[in-house]
């Protein structure tokens, strides 16, 4: 039995509120259970120096957590004077995951920065950031298309992510914090709407796992990502 009472293949309730902020070209507040992340997308008519003049666009991301997103206060990284290793790892993951669904030629020589700010954390913040970040990106690109700034849609496939793991010996979908902290195996699965893999992060936390168990987690992830993509499409319809 899961602490939440959910079935093994049951996701937490998902809601996506678009247009949550008025200034960003795209914004979405995604809630997956008690994990809440605000995602905004900003369009800039510039690109990093390493692709300047190439005609290619760029999508990048930044990630952070509010001090009381967790049960005890965390010091702001800006106060500490540097980003932690976890933050850097996660924002790089978000950026490369989102880029996997983008035609950078069609985007043109501009950059879109997706900011993901965790308001409340209860497990799966990086997955929620990727899923909500795609919605913010979709909304920002819609504005480019409406203005005629791009000829064709540069977003070729939705991108979403979900955590799956082995808890109490059972494969489970969408781990919350109590499950994540006790999981024997923990994994993050990033996929496209067409069920193509972008990245899989899996590690044995308390016990090793078999190929069969990995396949079970992959099946759960595919189901979960399908549900998340449906929520993305409903939010941006």
UniProtKB/Swiss-Prot annotation:
Binding, phosphate: 86, 124-126
Highest taxon, organism lineage: Bacteria
Annotated GO biological process: rRNA catabolic process; rRNA processing; tRNA processing
Catalytic reactions on record: tRNA(n+1) + phosphate = tRNA(n) + a ribonucleoside 5'-diphosphate
Keyword annotations of the record: Nucleotidyltransferase, RNA-binding, rRNA processing, Transferase, tRNA processing, tRNA-binding
InterPro entries cross-referenced by the UniProt entry: ExoRNase_PH_dom1 (IPR001247), ExoRNase_PH_dom2 (IPR015847), ExoRNase_PH_dom2_sf (IPR036345), PNPase/RNase_PH_dom_sf (IPR027408), Ribosomal_Su5_D2-typ_SF (IPR020568), RNase_PH (IPR050080), RNase_PH_bac-type (IPR002381), RNase_PH_CS (IPR018336)
Gene Ontology molecular function terms on file: 3'-5'-RNA exonuclease activity; tRNA binding; tRNA nucleotidyltransferase activity
Pfam families for this protein: RNase_PH (PF01138), RNase_PH_C (PF03725)
Enzyme class: transferase
Listed EC numbers: 2.7.7.56
Function: Phosphorolytic 3'-5' exoribonuclease that plays an important role in tRNA 3'-end maturation. Removes nucleotide residues following the 3'-CCA terminus of tRNAs; can also add nucleotides to the ends of RNA molecules by using nucleoside diphosphates as substrates, but this may not be physiologically important. Probably plays a role in initiation of 16S rRNA degradation (leading to ribosome degradation) during starvation.
Family membership noted in the UniProt record: Belongs to the RNase PH family.
Oligomer and partners: Homohexameric ring arranged as a trimer of dimers.
Stated name of the protein: Ribonuclease PH
The gene coding this protein: rph
């Amino acid at each position: 039995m899961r602490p939440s009472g959910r079935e093994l293949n049951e996701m937490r309730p998902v809601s996506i509120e678009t247009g949550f902020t008025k200034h960003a070209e795209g914004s979405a507040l995604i809630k997956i259970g008690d994990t809440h992340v605000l995602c905004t997308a900003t369009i800039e008519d510039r690109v990093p120096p390493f692709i300047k003049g190439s005609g290619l666009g760029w999508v990048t991301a930044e990630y952070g957590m509010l001090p009381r997103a967790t049960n005890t206060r965390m010091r702001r990284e800006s106060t500490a004077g540097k980003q932690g290793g976890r933050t850097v790892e996660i924002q790089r993951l978000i950026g490369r995951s989102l880029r996997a669904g983008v035609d950078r030629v069609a985007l043109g020589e501009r950059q879109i920065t997706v900011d993901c700010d965790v308001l409340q954390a209860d497990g799966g913040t990086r997955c929620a950031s990727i899923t909500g970040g795609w919605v913010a990106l979709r909304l920002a690109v819609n504005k480019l298309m409406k203005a005629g700034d791009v000829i064709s849609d540069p977003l070729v496939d939705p991108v979403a992510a979900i955590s799956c793991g082995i808890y109490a010996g059972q494969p489970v979908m969408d781990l919350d914090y109590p499950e994540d902290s006790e999981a024997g195996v923990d994994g993050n699965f990033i996929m496209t709407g067409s069920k193509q893999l972008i990245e899989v992060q899996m590690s044995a936390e308390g016990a090793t796992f078999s190929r069969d168990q990995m396949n079970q987690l992959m099946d759960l992830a595919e189901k979960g990502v399908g549900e998340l993509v449906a929520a993305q499409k409903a939010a941006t319809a």
